[in-house]
Amino acid sequence: MERKFLTDLGLNPDQVNSIMAQYGKDMQEYEGLEAERDALKKTSSELSSKIEDLKANSANVEELTKQIEKLKSDNENATKQLNAQKLDFAVTSTIKDFGAKNAKAVKALLNHDDIRFDSKGNLIGLEDQLKSLKDSDSYLFAEDKPAGKPIQAFPTGNPVAGGKDVSLHQKIAQRLKG
């Protein structure tokens, strides 16, 4: 996200700074989760390669079989952990997309047993829960504020820059002259 984009949308500098600060926090959290995910992927691939190495070197079959079973178990655990993290990241991301003010509070109110990925990798069961939660506990979510009318500084409207309108200063000077 770039400051110029937000400025072009008509946001003032304070609003842009606030948005950029929150965006920076979200990106740090996202990068931390990505690093953790990558570490789990690396662990999973290392365990898979160790399993293959043990299969190739079958000097002591019984001991190697035990090691293979242990590595398979470790690999399954790492895969489960990776999938759980992937699901957690997707849930957190979707909660933020729904405009939650506090993702942890919203996440605590969800039934995680009903949330899962389908065969195409899409989340199932989360959107309905978030919609019903947004209806019942709307205070947890940011309001969608419609764009309001601009404030008029003058009762006849704001003067047009470079227009024929006489400035307020000139009107006061004319009134004082008589």
Curated annotation (Swiss-Prot):
The keyword Cell membrane does not apply. This is Capsid assembly scaffolding protein. The lineage of its organism: Viruses, Duplodnaviria, Heunggongvirae, Uroviricota, Caudoviricetes. Belongs to the SPP1-like scaffolding protein family. Pfam families: Phage_scaffold. Scaffolding protein involved in the icosahedric procapsid assembly. Coassembles with the capsid proteins to form the procapsid, in which the scaffolding protein is found within the external shell of icosahedrally arranged capsid protein subunits. In a subsequent step the scaffolding protein molecules are released from the procapsid. Homodimer. GO terms for biological process: viral capsid assembly. InterPro entries: SCAF. It comes from Lactococcus phage LL-H. Keywords: Viral capsid assembly, Viral release from host cell.
